[in-house]
Amino acid sequence: MTNFRKTNPLMKIVNNAFIDLPAPSNISSWWNFGSLLGVCLILQILTGLFLAMHYTSDTTTACSSVAHICRDVNYGWIIRYMHANGASMFFVCLFMHVGRGLYYGSYTFLETWNIGMILLFTTMATAFMGYVLPWGQMSFWGATVITNLLSAIPYIGTNLVEWIWGGFSVDKATLTRFFAFHFILPFIITALAMVHLLFLHETGSNNPSGIPSDADKIPFHPYYTIKDILGMMLLILILMLLVLFTPDLLGDPDNYTPANPLNTPPHIKPEWYFLFAYAILRSIPKKLGGVLALVLSILILVLMPLLHKSKQWSMMFQPISQCLVWILVADLLTLTWIGGQPVEHPYIIIGQLASIMYFLIILVMMPVASTIENNLLKW
């Protein structure tokens, strides 16, 4: 009798994606983050669904509805904090996943990489809108500052901002539409993730050595299913440690104060996972220049296939490029730190130097390092 999973049309798709999928035998734990992102997405959709059942997207009641969820709803506090800290875990996995793609040259799979970039932008948009929903001080002023950046676009900027706001300031209309978008976008992310997987399975996974692994493949199940389950258990352990011991560690105390348009917080800053981009934005005194730098700080990843000058796929055998990647990581951590600091000396100059360094490493140093390594190997 033929195996059910190989004959049933629906099970055949699952089988070819997660069971009988030929996978390289040497992929490391850096390849775990794709499945961890899937777990984060499912967790965020489920917790978000239960939060949406009790949340009201009205400026007068939004903040108190979040307090009501935490105080009066059965296990509402754990759902709320799992959702808030789940977003942080999502971005940790996302940054690791993109970093692995950069290090091991996964950007050579053009379709997979470009859909991954769309996924990154969509996830960032979703997280930003989610941060506005509790309608605390940081929610309100964060929304005001970030949406206002669009006014830097020549000719249409001001009209565009008012169109997004649904009025002349961030108000009820803005909150309602942000809630609507925040609810629908995760489902769009799910669809995009499926397309991402579809294109990945057309080419097969990359591997640390960057050498084609067609001659040495193993089935995905049980080898990598077990490995992924271990990763998932560790992810959930870290998330629950955060939720149960320090739920507000990554949040901002200002967001427990209900939004007040007449009182600006001393330091307006986004969630920690946007701080690096925020630091790049602030490092340029001109508004339009800052906005362009902000967009380019993420969009630069789309250029990675064009900037790839090495004759090798992976950085496993490229010591100079390896050093540059870790300098880039240190630079991003510096930018994240600067993004959370007030705009004063010496933070301004550190932020400007770190921003210049960020673009310099990616656009100049890495292609030059690859060319040097090619010449050293007489290629």
Swiss-Prot record:
Heme b b566 binds at H97, H196. GO terms for cellular component: mitochondrial inner membrane; respiratory chain complex III. The cytochrome bc1 complex contains 11 subunits: 3 respiratory subunits (MT-CYB, CYC1 and UQCRFS1), 2 core proteins (UQCRC1 and UQCRC2) and 6 low-molecular weight proteins (UQCRH/QCR6, UQCRB/QCR7, UQCRQ/QCR8, UQCR10/QCR9, UQCR11/QCR10 and a cleavage product of UQCRFS1). This cytochrome bc1 complex then forms a dimer. It is found in: Mitochondrion inner membrane. Heme 1 (or BL or b562) is low-potential and absorbs at about 562 nm, and heme 2 (or BH or b566) is high-potential and absorbs at about 566 nm. Keywords: Electron transport, Extinct organism protein, Heme, Iron, Membrane, Metal-binding, Mitochondrion, Mitochondrion inner membrane, Respiratory chain, Transmembrane, Transmembrane helix, Transport, Ubiquinone. Belongs to the cytochrome b family. Binds 2 heme b groups non-covalently. Pfam families: Cytochrom_B_C, Cytochrome_B. The gene is MT-CYB. It comes from Myotragus balearicus (Balearic islands cave goat). It is a multi-pass membrane protein. A ubiquinone binds at H201. This is Cytochrome b. GO terms for molecular function: metal ion binding; ubiquinol-cytochrome-c reductase activity. The chain crosses the membrane at residues 33-53, 77-98, 113-133, 178-198, 226-246, 288-308, 320-340, 347-367. Component of the ubiquinol-cytochrome c reductase complex (complex III or cytochrome b-c1 complex) that is part of the mitochondrial respiratory chain. The b-c1 complex mediates electron transfer from ubiquinol to cytochrome c. Contributes to the generation of a proton gradient across the mitochondrial membrane that is then used for ATP synthesis.
